[in-house]
């Protein structure tokens, strides 16, 4: 009282002004799995705050447990105000229809807080009635209700004010009571508590609850579960214990800081399953969804930490594979849910078929469960056909998003069949140099400007390695289940041609793939054929061997002083991307990693790759191996990565996962001392 206004979170104009000066608040962050505590100390106001934020386990709420401590030697009167803006709509509306969508808001002050229920949501797809309720509520530590509220931005900020310098706080304006209804305004979770007197060394506690619900009574029940300090502390302990148990991998490397960092890395896949790829609605991958690779890479980590549900996840994820070997790119929120892209032909990433087998192979190695390859899964179906080169005009919403037979039945094939479709279609989709076409991009999303003529040697290596390992799995399967034949869709016989002359003939390979995709353009026969294990193993092995020998023979730029490496790509002008030219040495790490990992690189070549990578890519100053050398060119015939500053993102940065894969590849091949 009469001393000023202090932000316990540091979100005030005064706090901003004091940054980097002697008057700046002292602060300390302590973070754990799904919770964090921030302490602040104000020398000026002689107050200390401790704010613990956590996400509840079973409820759609985030809770802030706040402690305000008087460190002065005299009594202090304080009036606590909590302020959380309630945006209450899609992140898209930050740019589109921001003002108009605020007019949809129906705001109400309740006993403990503010609720906002927009009447509807709308965009270019249409109008939808809204059922969600956004709310911010609060209580004193003993459970006492707030005394008043600031339910709109206008009421809180005031004319000319800001969130960091609000009129309601600085002029101590009275709030509104419970029971007030307001329509068509930007909403604010402004909560004012009764003034209290803090004696020296005394602490007051408060709880702020933020959440989303579908029913009014659900809001009341949620608030009642957390409306006191005791309830909030108990919920916090539950959260801490749960996630400590869930993230159950521990690391002991001799470097305790690194060990703790790896615990956070282990936690990240859980965050991605819950929140998607981004937690910031307007930063980078702001839509926050998960992609095809995320599904499979999350399974990899969960195999170590939460293996119980992984089998069903793996089987369900195969339902995203199309009969032409491509896959759905819009992932639903439920297990095995995939959504059709109705905006025309969607982008095809040529690496997408690599990851399902890599994940399944780790699952097999961990469990010995080869029977999973005989589990049945559906195939995804939408209007996209011909591996993203055609539209199936006969497909409709009524057809549904599962591949059907000519008789109208939803077709199911084994996981093994899905893997064969993915890899065999990729085998035949080649460019001018008989390497697999790059299409929209591969693992490196920024190689996105060579869709017509680009080729990815790097991932051609990866597919070859997968084909060879899939043959190994079939041998294991043959021994374990005592079976001599496998059942496959009749149309797949087209892809099972085993003819070396065909492999060398680019046009013939492309024609064979066209024949298959045309046959499967809309419906499939549903008829089955029996294929012997021995012939299938031989078929896959021949294809893998041919790819590897072809790459060894045609994609090796030989350097000086026993240096050499594999060319990783061809650009849209059909030129090799790597090698030695007038512009200097051009080398990329990706092609080396997959050549080594797949078995394409010979031991002699690995030695030369290591020497070249150490020479051209390793940079101790940035912490490891760069993704590529500096091409000193924009390369509009390859991808946007060359527009990034060198050393940023895909253009020459140290990509931790690729350097880890490089280490793993060397380890697998016996090159780690």
Language-model regions: role of each:
Residues 1, 319-328, 380-389, 487-502, ...:
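Short, mixed-charge aromatic SLiMs
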Residues 328-341, 388-403, 494-512, 556, ...:
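Charged/polar, low-hydrophobicity segments characteristic of intrinsically disordered regions
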Residues 193, 217, 237-256, 261, ...:
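Long, charged, mostly alpha-helical binding arms that flank functional sites
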Residues 543-557:
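Metal-assisted phosphate- and nucleotidyl-transfer catalytic regions
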Residues 281-295, 340-350, 446-460, 575-599, ...:
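Solvent-exposed loop and edge beta-strand segments that line ligand/cofactor-binding
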């Amino acid at each position: 009282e009469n001393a000023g206004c202090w932000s316990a979170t540091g979100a005030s104009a005064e706090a901003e002004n004091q940054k980097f000066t002697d008057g700046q608040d002292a602060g300390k962050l302590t973070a754990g799995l799904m919770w964090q505590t921030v302490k602040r100390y104000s020398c000026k106001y002689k107050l200390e705050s401790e704010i613990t934020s956590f996400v509840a386990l079973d409820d759609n709420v985030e809770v802030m447990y706040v402690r305000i401590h008087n460190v002065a030697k005299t009594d202090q009167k304080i009036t606590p105000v909590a302020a959380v803006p309630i945006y209450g709509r899609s992140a898209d509306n930050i740019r589109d229809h921001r003002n108009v969508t605020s007019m949809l808001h129906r705001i109400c002050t309740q006993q403990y807080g503010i609720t906002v229920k927009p009447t509807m949501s709308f965009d270019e797809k249409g109008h939808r009635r809204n059922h969600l309720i956004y709310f911010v509520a609060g209580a004193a530590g003993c459970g006492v209700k707030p005394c008043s509220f600031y339910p709109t931005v206008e009421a809180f900020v005031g004319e000319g004010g800001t969130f960091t310098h609000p009129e309601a706080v600085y002029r101590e304006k009275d709030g509104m009571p419970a029971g007030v209804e307001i329509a068509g305004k930007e909403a604010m979770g402004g909560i004012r508590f009764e003034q209290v007197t803090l004696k020296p060394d005394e602490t007051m506690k408060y709880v702020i609850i933020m959440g989303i619900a579908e029913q009014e009574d659900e809001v009341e029940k949620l608030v009642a579960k957390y409306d006191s300090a005791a309830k909030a502390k108990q919920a916090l302990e539950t959260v801490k214990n749960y996630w400590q148990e869930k993230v159950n991998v521990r690391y002991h490397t001799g470097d305790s800081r690194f060990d703790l960092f790896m615990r956070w890395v282990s936690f990240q896949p859980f965050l991605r399953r819950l929140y998607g790829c981004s937690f910031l609605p307007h930063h980078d991958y702001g839509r926050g969804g998960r992609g095809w690779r995320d599904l499979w890479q999350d399974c990899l980590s969960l195999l170590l930490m939460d293996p119980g549900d992984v089998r069903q996840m793996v089987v369900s994820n195969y339902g995203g594979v199309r009969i032409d070997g491509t896959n759905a790119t819009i992932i639903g929120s439920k297990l095995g849910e995939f959504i059709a892209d109705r905006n025309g032909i969607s982008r095809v990433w040529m690496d997408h078929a690599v990851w399902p087998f890599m994940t399944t192979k780790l699952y097999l190695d961990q469990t010995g469960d080869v029977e999973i390859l005989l589990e049945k899964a559906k195939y995804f179906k939408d209007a996209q056909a011909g591996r993203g080169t055609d539209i199936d005009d006969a497909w409709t919403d009524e057809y549904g998003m599962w591949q059907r037979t000519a008789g109208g039945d939803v077709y199911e094939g084994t996981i093994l069949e899905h893997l064969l479709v993915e890899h065999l279609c990729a085998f035949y989709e080649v460019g001018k140099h008989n390497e697999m076409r790059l299409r929209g991009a591969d693992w490196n999303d920024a190689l996105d400007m060579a869709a017509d003529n680009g080729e990815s040697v790097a991932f051609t290596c990866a597919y070859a390695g997968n084909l060879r390992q899939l043959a190994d799995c079939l041998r294991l399967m043959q021994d374990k289940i005592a079976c001599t034949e496998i059942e496959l869709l009749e149309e797949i016989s087209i892809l099972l041609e085993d003819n070396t002359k065909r492999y060398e003939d680019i046009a013939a390979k492309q024609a064979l793939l066209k024949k298959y995709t045309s046959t499967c353009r809309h419906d499939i026969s549903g008829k089955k054929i029996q294929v012997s294990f021995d012939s299938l193993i031989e078929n896959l092995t021949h294809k893998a061997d041919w790819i590897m020998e072809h790459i060894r023979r045609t994609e090796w730029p030989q350097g000086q002083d026993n240096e050499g490496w594999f060319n990783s790509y061809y650009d849209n002008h059909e030129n090799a991307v790597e090698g030695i030219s007038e512009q200097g040495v051009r080398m990329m790490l990706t092609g080396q990693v997959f050549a080594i990992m797949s078995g394409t690189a010979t031991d002699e070549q690995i030695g030369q790759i290591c020497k070249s990578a150490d020479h051209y890519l390793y940079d101790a100053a940035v912490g490891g191996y760069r993704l590529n050398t500096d091409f000193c060119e924009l390369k509009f015939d390859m991808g946007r990565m060359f527009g990034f500053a060198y050393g940023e993102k895909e253009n020459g940065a140290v990509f931790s996962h690729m350097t880890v894969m490089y280490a793993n590849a060397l380890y697998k091949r016996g090159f780690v001392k």
